[in-house]
């Protein structure tokens, strides 16, 4: 989903996906469900990955979250500002982000009932874009209703509008779609992982 409408250049720095049977241990010694590294590696606990994919409306999807980080890492700033082709658009988004992030942090502090973006987004600004990505795809109608300006920015960033999607499809239907489209996608794609180039 995250690469469907954006340039493959957004992920050209990504090269390795590691799944762990148990909770992986980060460099600081903490166990966590997963993380994305600026150098191009994503590490995730398999069960957390599976659970996130099996429930499309719980606002928790580890894979969407970590790939959101990877998208943010393209410009090496780690600031919840993904790549924009236009410098003017990037500046507009940065100004919007400052206000929106402060407002969501305040909403969580005051418990105003407008916390559609999960609290983890307020722990560090670098987590904001990834948590918003999860909400955008898993609770799109709620984000559009409660945070319309933020939703409109995400539509612009991902170039899709999930609140308008007619319905969710089952895992079996998605798998059929993958099989039907895979050969054509591979034929048209110029993207290859670093592993394939080695």
What are these regions (language model features)?
Residues 15, 40-42, 60:
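Generic beta-strand structural signal
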Residues 58-75, 130:
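Active-site recognition of the HExxH zinc-binding catalytic motif
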